[in-house]
């Protein structure tokens, strides 16, 4: 599968996507605890808020991507996520601000997932989609592990801002890979109910 340029590019983008999220998320709770005095229950609630954002956004992102294009959604959400990640350490001054930032973060993360998965499956025929998704998930897990491994030493030496900066770089790199190297499948025009009934 990886011998095809577009599939190798999509796989690399999947790796970068999870690496960026890992760099941002892994030390976020510890930073909130150290800098803002956030309690474990407050941090747990923040992740609940983020989960709600994810659940609410995912299906809508899939529908929107069918109308305006999967690549466009992936790129726009990635660039938005890059902005949020860059500003995180500068705008979070209280735990309620962290809730708002994390809510927006998870909206943008969810906006990438469904459209990008659909973009991946459109690259191969039906018989090879399972293999491609398994490969992508494995690379995503590897990317998350690499991000987590880098986050610790960076945090120890330079602080959480270094994690957010490197995470931002990974997210922007993913957007660039998708934008320039991953093809957009043709969108199928929606049929009206009258035409569908006539068929």
Regions found by a protein language model. Name each.
Residues 7-48:
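Extracytoplasmic gate region of multi-pass secondary transporters
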Residues 123-156:
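A late C-terminal transmembrane helix in Major Facilitator Superfamily
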């Amino acid at each position: 599968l990886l011998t095809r340029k577009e599939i190798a590019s999509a796989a690399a983008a999947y790796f970068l996507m999870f690496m960026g999220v890992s760099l941002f998320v892994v030390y976020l709770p510890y930073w909130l605890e150290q800098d803002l005095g956030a309690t474990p229950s407050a941090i747990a609630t923040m992740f609940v808020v983020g989960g709600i954002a994810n659940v609410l956004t995912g299906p809508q992102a899939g529908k929107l991507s069918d109308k305006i294009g999967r690549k466009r959604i992936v790129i726009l959400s990635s660039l938005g996520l890059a902005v949020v990640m860059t500003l995180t350490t500068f705008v979070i001054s209280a735990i309620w601000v962290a809730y708002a930032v994390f809510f927006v973060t998870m909206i943008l993360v969810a906006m990438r997932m469904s459209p990008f998965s659909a973009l991946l499956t459109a690259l191969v025929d039906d018989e090879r989609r399972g293999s491609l998704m398994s490969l992508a998930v494995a690379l995503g897990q590897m990317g998350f592990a690499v991000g987590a491994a880098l986050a610790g030493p960076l945090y120890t030496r330079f602080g959480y801002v270094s994690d957010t900066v490197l995470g931002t770089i990974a997210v922007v790199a993913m957007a660039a890979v998708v934008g320039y190297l991953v093809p957009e499948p043709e969108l199928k025009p929606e049929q009206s109910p009258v035409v569908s009934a006539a068929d």
